[in-house]
Structure formats: C-alpha cells, structure tokens
Amino acid sequence: MSGVKYEVAKFNGDNGFSTWQRRMRDLLIQQGLHKVLDVDSKKPDTMKAEDWADLDERAASAIRLHLSDDVVNNIIDEDTARGIWTRLESLYMSKTLTNKLYLKKQLYALHMSEGTNFLSHLNVFNGLITQLANLGVKIEEEDKAILLLNSLPSSYDNLATTILHGKTTIELKDVTSALLLNEKMRKKPENQGQALITEGRGRSYQRSSNNYGRSGARGKSKNRSKSRVRNCYNCNQPGHFKRDCPNPRKGKGETSGQKNDDNTAAMVQNNDNVVLFINEEEECMHLSGPESEWVVDTAASHHATPVRDLFCRYVAGDFGTVKMGNTSYSKIAGIGDICIKTNVGCTLVLKDVRHVPDLRMNLISGIALDRDGYESYFANQKWRLTKGSLVIAKGVARGTLYRTNAEICQGELNAAQDEISVDLWHKRMGHMSEKGLQILAKKSLISYAKGTTVKPCDYCLFGKQHRVSFQTSSERKLNILDLVYSDVCGPMEIESMGGNKYFVTFIDDASRKLWVYILKTKDQVFQVFQKFHALVERETGRKLKRLRSDNGGEYTSREFEEYCSSHGIRHEKTVPGTPQHNGVAERMNRTIVEKVRSMLRMAKLPKSFWGEAVQTACYLINRSPSVPLAFEIPERVWTNKEVSYSHLKVFGCRAFAHVPKEQRTKLDDKSIPCIFIGYGDEEFGYRLWDPVKKKVIRSRDVVFRESEVRTAADMSEKVKNGIIPNFVTIPSTSNNPTSAESTTDEVSEQGEQPGEVIEQGEQLDEGVEEVEHPTQGEEQHQPLRRSERPRVESRRYPSTEYVLISDDREPESLKEVLSHPEKNQLMKAMQEEMESLQKNGTYKLVELPKGKRPLKCKWVFKLKKDGDCKLVRYKARLVVKGFEQKKGIDFDEIFSPVVKMTSIRTILSLAASLDLEVEQLDVKTAFLHGDLEEEIYMEQPEGFEVAGKKHMVCKLNKSLYGLKQAPRQWYMKFDSFMKSQTYLKTYSDPCVYFKRFSENNFIILLLYVDDMLIVGKDKGLIAKLKGDLSKSFDMKDLGPAQQILGMKIVRERTSRKLWLSQEKYIERVLERFNMKNAKPVSTPLAGHLKLSKKMCPTTVEEKGNMAKVPYSSAVGSLMYAMVCTRPDIAHAVGVVSRFLENPGKEHWEAVKWILRYLRGTTGDCLCFGGSDPILKGYTDADMAGDIDNRKSSTGYLFTFSGGAISWQSKLQKCVALSTTEAEYIAATETGKEMIWLKRFLQELGLHQKEYVVYCDSQSAIDLSKNSMYHARTKHIDVRYHWIREMVDDESLKVLKISTNENPADMLTKVVPRNKFELCKELVGMHSN
C-alpha cells in the first residue's frame, strides 16, 4: 500500500469544496494523518507530545499542498491542521441561510439542455445534493427523484412517464438506473429497418425509433432511404423525378410503389384510411400461424387480419383496396369484430378489424386501441397494454416488430366464459322466445350450436302464460316520432328499491323503440313526458307529431294539454272502454311485466327488485327482434348502428366484482361477491347488488357464474320485505291504480320491444324530482337538470359510490305535515307557535293600505335532536319570505353579531379551571321580541286564516323569523335589557356580557342568537338572572349546559376538567358521504398528496364527472368540525378548500383521506382544565408550501387552561422570499390574535404577568426585536412590522421554542405520525 500514489486536485476556491474535502480526508486517512482533524481529538497517552505535533504539522502541510495560492492566502495565519480545516469550512461551506438558499436555487433551477451529456448533468445534480446534505439540508428521496426528472429536457418526457407509471413512491436510485440504461441504449446504432410505417393520402411517415413512452409518441420523419438516392415514382428508375420522366405516365391504378432500402411494402386504402406498413421480406417469414401471433403497430389506424374465421361479427362488402409492395392490389373483403384471449388471460375485443386475405400476419393497431380507451407502453423491448390499473396484454420485440400471442375466443367483457348454449342465451335475453333467438343467430348477432332448441322453461310459464290473442292488423308509421304510444302501469304491490310503484312507457311507432320511466306517483307523468320530449327531439333532430294515450287523469290535465298545444303535438286519446286503440302500449306493459316476473322468479330475488328487473328487461327488449319490424332490431332501427350481445349475462346470477387496489390493502380480498341486476350506462359495464353493504355498485371488471343464482340466505330480512336501507322511501300519494296487466284479448301482436328506464327518486322540493339512471345501452341521455340531492357515484370514479341514506326527513310544507307519521306532534307545534305570536302581539289583522304589498310567509318544521341524535322536540316556526323585501322600504340596517367560537371555548376553559357553574337557556321565538321600525304587512299564515277575514292582511308589530332585520332587532332588544341590568358588554366580543359582584364573584353571559350560556360561581345570582330574563322574554331553562352549537359538553367537576366533542356530528358526516366503514388513516393528509391546480379538470367531460361529486358539501362539513373542535384537520381542510371552484379527482381523494382520518378519530375531543388559566401562543410557517403560487402558510394556535381555544391555518397574502420572512409574517398574524385575546381576558378581569408567543425561528425573533438583516428584509410590507411595536412596549414577547415542541407545526404542513400525535397532545386533544 505504501507504494501506491494517490492524486487529489488542488482546490482553487470555486464550487466543489464538498467533493475536495471528502477526497482530502480520504488522502489523510491513507497517510494516517486524519486523527488531528477531529473536533474532540486529543493526544493519545501513549504518544509523545513531539510525535503529536509532528503529526499535526504533516497533516497541515498536506492540506496546504493541495490548495491553490489564492486559497492559501486566506488561511495563512492558521498553523494547525484543525484550524486550517475549520477555516476552509467557514469560508467555502458556510451553513448560513444565504448559502442554503443559493444552493437550493441552483438545484431547483438546474436544467439539462438538449444534446447535453447526461452523465455530466447527473454529476452536477449529485454534487448539489451532496453540498446541501453537508449543510444539514435533508431532501426526501421522492423529491430528489422528481427534481432530477424535472431537470431533464422535453425529449425525456415519455421516459419519465414510463418510469412514474403505476408507482405511488419512487427513489432517486430507481430514476438514476433507468436514465443510465436509457443513455446506453441511446448510444446504440440505429436500426436500419423500420418496423411499421404509416401512409395516408399518398404520403408515408416513418415511426421514430424511440420506443419509450406511450403509443402516441411517434416520430414524424418522412419515409426515405438512409442513402439520398431517390427513384422516379413513374418508372422506378434512379436519376430523375416523375415530372422529368421520359417514359409514358402510368394510370392511377398502375403506379409503382416506391421501394426503398428497407424493403418496405405499403398497404393503403383508396379512401385514405391509414392502415400500416410492414417489412415484408424480413419480418413476415419469421411469423407463426396468424391464429396465435399478432403484430402491434402504433402507426396503423385499423386492425387487420387475413383469416376470415377469426371474426365473431362480420360484414362483407367493398371497403376499398390495399396496395402491396409488389405493386399489386388486394381488396378489403370485409369488416368486423374479433375477440381474443390475451397472454395474460384477459379478453380483448378488437373492433372494426379489416379482413385483407393477402396479408401474411395479424395486425393490432395502437391508434384503434387508444380510441377505445386503452393505453400502450413501449420500454426495454417490451410492450404492455393497460386500461386503468388492469394489464390487458403483453408483448416483446423480436426483430424489428413487437409481437404478442393470443387465442381466439368469443368476447365476454373481461369475464369468465362458460360454454354458450341456446338455453343460456334464452336466460341472458330475459327469457326471449326461441324464434327471436333464431333470428338473432341468423343475423350473426349471437351464436350457439346449430340444431339445438330451447328446453321447456318453467319460469316462462310462471311469468308469461296468457290467453291466445286475436289477430288484428296494424299499420306502422314510416318516419320516427310521427306517432308515439304511452301508457302507465301500476301500482305494484310493493315499492321498488327507490320507493317507486309505477312505470310509464313511451313507444315510437316507426322503430318500436321504448322508453320507460319509473315513478312514485302517476302525477309525475307530465314531468317525465317533458323530459322524454326534449330527449328524443334533440337526439333525432325531428319533431314529435302525435301522442296516443288513454283517458287517465295523468294525461288529461290542463297543463298537459297546454304543453302539447304549444309544441304542436296532436294528443290522441282513446275512446273509453276501447283499449285496443292503444294496443301497442297496452301490450308492451304486459311484455315488460311478464319478463320481470320470469326474471325475478328464476333469480329468486324479492319483489322489491322489480325496478331493477324492469330496467334490465327493457334493455334486453331494445335488442330483441320485433314482429312489426319484420324481425329487425328496434335499437338498430332507431340509432342506425350495430348492436352488440357479447356482454350480456343472466339476470340474478352470481358475480364477483374486482376491488381496485386503491380501495383495499395487500391482504384484503381482490373481489367481492355480488348479484348481477343489470347493465350500466355504457355497453361494457354492469350493475351489481352487494348483499353485505346493501348497496348497488357498478363495475366493468367482473367474473360471472351464470349457472348459479343467489339463495335466500344471501339477502337480509329487510331486503326480503322490500325495505332497502340505502334508499329513502316516500309513500305514493296517488289513489288511482292502473291495471298492471292488460286483460284485453284483441290487441296488436307487438312482440318483444326495446326499452329504456329512468327511475324516479324521492321528491326534494315542490315540483322537483330526482331522476336516477337511464339504461339506454350504448348511448346515454342524462336528465337536462342537475339534482339537488347527493349524487350517485361518478362513473369514472368508482370510489365515490353514493346512495341515499335513510333518515328522518323533515316536512317542508303543510301538505306534507298532513301525511307525516308525526302529524299530531307537528300540528301541536304549529298551534304553540300561533299562540306565542298572539301572546306576544306580533301582528294584527288590517285592511291592506293602498300602494302597499304584503309579504308571503311559510311554515318551517324542525325535528330537534340531542347530542346522541335522539329526537327531543318538534318545532314549527312561521317564517316571512324576506327575500321579497326591498331595501329602503322594508328595511335599512341588518347586521347583527353572534358570539365568537373562540369566546365560547375561552369561557368554557375558564369555567373548567375555576370550577364555575355553566347553565344554558333558550329563548322561545327570540326574533318575535324585536320591535319593528318599518311598516310591514304579511299574508295570513297558511292553515290559520280567519273565517270571513281572508281578504285581510297581518300588520307586523314585532319582527318575525325571515325578516332581514329580525336578528338585528332582537339583538338590540336583548342588549337594551342587559344594560338595564347593569351588565357590561365587552368591546372584544359584543355578545359577551360581564358583571362583577365582588372580587371572586362574577357572571358571564354568552349570546348566540337565541342560545345562551351563563357562567358564574354563585348559583343564587345565576338563578336571579334567569328569573329576570324570564320576566322579559319567553325563556326555556335547559339546566347545566350539555350541548352548544352541535358541540357536546362533558364535565368532571372533581378533577376540574371539561371536554368538547363533535363525535355524533362527525358520525353523521361520515354516514352522509358513505365513509362510515372506510379504512382509517393516522394523519389527516398524506405526504404523497401534492395538490395543485394542474389537477383540476379541463375538459367538459371531466367537469361533468366532477359535478356529480359532492365536493363542496364535504369540505363545508369538514370546515364546521375544524372551526369548532378539531384543530388537527385545520391544515388539511385549508388545502382542499383552495380548489372549491374547480375540484379534480385527486382533490376529491384528499377529501376522502380527511374523512378516513376522522373515521379513526371520531371520539377525539378538546380537553380543558387541570392546569392554571394561562394564555400561550404558538406560531409557525411553511415556506412556499403552495405549489401553484409559491405562497407560504401561516399557522397559529393558542392554549388556555391546557386546551386549544384559537387556531388558524391559511395562506399568506404575499410571496415570502425567505423562511425568515415567512416566519416573521406568521408571527405578526399571531401577535394580532394574542392582543385580541389579551384584551378579552383583561375585560373579564383576568391578568397574567406576560403574554408569550413561541416561535421556532430565531431569525424571525431577532427581526421582531430589531431592524436586522436590512438588505434582505427592506422589502417587507410595513404592516408586518407592527409586531416590533408590540414587542418594544412589552405588550407581548416572542420567545424561541424547539420545532419538536411547537404544536403549530401541524397547522402548516404534513408532519409524521409521531410528531402529529405529539402536537395533538400539546393542544389538549384526547380520544374520548
């Protein structure tokens, strides 16, 4: 080893000190001189002082010899090795904030230019990372990886997409290895032959050799030989162009194909559709049989095959020609679909495949797959096809082509396939007749063994046996929408899952296409007809001419007739007693009911599933041959498009739905057992019933057991009885039943008809109903308005599944009260309200003066519950419709304060610490006590009009609920009363009243509209105040406070502790958004959720999908919990609130993450007491935490008597240029809150020696005391220097605290679980 010489370059003072220092230390280690460099190094006892001094001199000499002259001059006065080493570190590795900021800026701004050597760029990147690490700056592995990828030029975008695909986390070593491998491959010589090339409109383009990224990443270089020799397009000879060719011009059909050095043969359709190019001589000879091997080409616009037998659906015809490399032409003999089973076991349906007999291989088009929603990835000589998170197929590169193996099968939508028999098709098609199945088979729409017949089906007899009908002739209209038949069927003996009892049909005479709307009551027919009318006219562009129906009251209303007349629709009503005139609709009702009866019987499902069965039956009828159409398919006649049958399944069979990995853990089941009950909004999608969770789910990744049906044990007793807890059931109010089955013998033979179903939900507001799912096959037409109830799951986001929750619904009108189960109690509440109005002299009946207008009024009902969600009171209130008021006439000032939530927590914490009494009161009809200053008239209350005086109006003497000035008038009345009792109103909070009787005896009153809290030590004085209040106002004494504004109050007087909890509220929120059974998480926001505006939807489709997600409602619900008792979610709620205007899928995932956190911490509450009532403040900031505008976050938190009383987490209004500035701004905001709390407590007679705000930034603390760092702080807005004045006059102090002990840290950023739990403990949050 002694003979080895080590070289270390001299350090010249430029960048790279960290690398030089590392190498220099290694050199000293090799020479045995490193011991003198350590800070705590001491001379060993066994070594002489002379030897130690010699060792130090040799080390110092070695260091100086490896420094340039300029650097040596800077350390000339240092004699020892340790002194030189330390001086160099202070000069060239400064750990100041400025040096850190400089290196960070270099790292974040680092960008590799096109053509730059990647290894050089990687060395610079790693050098910056190392220097920052030496300065104590820790950068997470994921951040390092993302920074490296972001520093690469745009030519690396596809590679970056491939590296990040399917990963939730990534490390720098993964990115580095992939990039180094890519660098090696870039240096390989380019392939001379190109795999597949595209040609269109006489021009061909060569695909780029870069196979990284998705299929869309193709080069656009024109297809030319590597050499620049070009042949004439006319005679195919070199040396001249076509325009100069001496030979006669060839005709269009005789043009020679250009033959380049790659031996490429072109296939081009005459209609300019791009197909593909293949290397004919080299590649085709190496392929196995076309049934087993396929070639993948991302430049082809259509799939192609030479084998006719592969098609499961085929249409022969003249679809153009294909030009081959030998100048011959081959026709496209037909187009159809091919179903293949890929090498990973999935079923893939290739649509619109071109049949070209002269081809030598099967070809898969990447563009066609992309149009169908699949994604192709090419990397490392491998190909992978995915859809969502599911891998569909894989392939490898052999030669210059990507190939994959597949087997031919009958397409079944990614589902397990049994041997298809005629009996199975009979069940799939909803018990279709054998004749209908034969017609579909002749049309090659379905397939089964020839010569087989349908076995006798008992379920058909149970559901469809009827008398033989008389034959009548029927003349069908030639044009669609010339005539539409309609009829109502019902009521059913049991309500559907959605609470419906009727359905109405609309049938187009020309196409025999059917629409069915499921209803709660028959009076909804007019509304669904309006929807139907708008739907079909917009879809077809034609006008509806005639409507034929019976004389039912639902069709003969005045509004129905006026609507038809205004739109030019001739409404034909049948003669009473002659249903034959509307035989098409009558027969259709029978067909639907027969199918439903047979399907439910075979599936062994309860009758409450009749709505789902109707939907499925109509979906199948849409695709069944119709006798009046000469056995044509109504759906095809209506849309003029082919109909697919490959995805059909047996209604009620067992099914196993795949659970996405985002909704399960590694050990959870990957599928859930369900019952198949219908088809979704798209062709490839299913509706399934989950008998465990009692809800309907949608999925496209399903495995079916069509030979198995559910047993009675699969369903709960509630489902058997038709009661589905996930849906609100509203009883029908119609008393006019319609026959569920026509008993008429002489009806036109309609056959099985097509259908669409839109199921009607519960009534939300007067005249507004919720419309559920239309099942119309491939094309869906959603209702033209948005619903006002929580939406059903977005089709794109299965994780946002929502169904209605059964709950006690409050009546919204007097009409609903009369049919409400609690009618008597609600009527009693109304009577009590009227008596209170009369007792208070609220109004008197007068004649309406000329020029005046009366305001309208309505009844509002409330079923009040306690903290445990138990019904405790029925409340009815007469409310004026104040939105009709006009400013300057009916009102002037309207502002009215309410007590601050911070004041409530402060007073409750004081009560816990001093063991004070806390009593609660409620003012009955509080707003009725306010005196009006304006002259206002109102109509008489509904249900309480005075006989003989109905023309008179109410002149208001007192204010009423609903009036814009009512809150203000009540507050002024109450404030006047408190002043008369010599109570003082605090300036800090005008809804807090205080009166001191002696040094230790006082009363504090908090007012929140009509709710009051009284806090004091003397029960006698409290009782006196209650009595005085009861004399002036109608009060309700609630005794010791147990709940205020939804917060449950629990006290333990012996230990002087008080808890505030919102457990029941949070449980209701979780139930409302279907997260009650979600998997809990440990923190309210995960580190991988980097939310940005770039995640917001940009297309109309994406915005439409997100419009179905209750994002705003969920965030609003979370915000109320945060404001009251949950400071632990303040930061998370603040982040998701930034995207309320246009939320995206990732933002919704973050909201659900917060709900999952609440799911595991439902019982967490704030604890006060157990310590002295001392006010403490904590502040923190997160530098540039907002990804979009790089603004910093401010977080502050105040504790009093051991619990948090005030907190805030929000973005700063300006961009901070340093962490010092961000912390300084946060300290100023915290100081403002501290001064307010200080003043508030002092007004209550509470003083403490000093008021301290704790900050973990020493530089911000220094800046608050002195005007330091002028060059770096001179730009800070003067308003933020307010805190210096407060510190100078000793109004507050700013002191240092360790970051590990600062609870405000959780209000500005995502912190690890252990730190998060510590923060919660420091602010008094405990589990219940």
Swiss-Prot record:
The lineage of its organism: Eukaryota, Viridiplantae, Streptophyta, Embryophyta, Tracheophyta. Residues 729-742 have a biased composition (Polar residues). Residues 189-265, 729-800 are annotated as: Disordered. The keyword Zinc-finger applies. Residues 473-642 form the Integrase catalytic domain. Keywords: Aspartyl protease, Endonuclease, Hydrolase, Metal-binding, Nuclease, Nucleotidyltransferase, Protease, RNA-directed DNA polymerase, Transferase, Transposable element, Zinc, Zinc-finger. This is Retrovirus-related Pol polyprotein from transposon TNT 1-94. Pfam families: gag_pre-integrs, Pol_BBD, Retrotran_gag_2, rve, RVT_2, zf-CCHC. The keyword Metal-binding applies.
